[in-house]
Regions:
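Short cationic/low-complexity microdomains
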Residues: 47-56
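Vicinal oxygen chelate
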Residues: 1-43, 50, 65-68, 78-80
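Acidic/histidine-enriched, glycine/proline-rich intrinsically disordered or flexible terminal extensions
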Residues: 55-81
């Protein structure tokens, strides 16, 4: 599921996880019926395909520490030098 804001990301995530679902890594979660979903902010997609490969790696490394994606943390990782 592609999202554009943290609020939208949170809404989808909470709707799935908050109703009998399970959290997993890197934006993945599973609903109560066992269907897996990845809630992916567009900012993450742009960050991990950033033309500055070092910035893209920082974004990827930040994502690997997350369950639900935190857009501000991804953007901070890209901005770090």
């Amino acid at each position: 599921v592609a999202t554009t804001t943290q609020e939208e990301t949170d809404r989808y995530w909470n709707a799935i996880v908050g109703h009998g679902g399970q959290e997993s890594a890197c934006g993945w979660c599973k609903d109560r019926w066992g269907v897996s979903w990845q809630i992916t902010p567009m900012q993450l997609t742009r960050a991990i395909t950033h033309p500055d490969r070092a910035a893209a790696k920082r974004a990827f490394d930040a994502m690997m520490t997350m369950r639900k994606i935190d857009i501000a943390a991804i953007e901070a990782a890209v901005a770090r030098r």
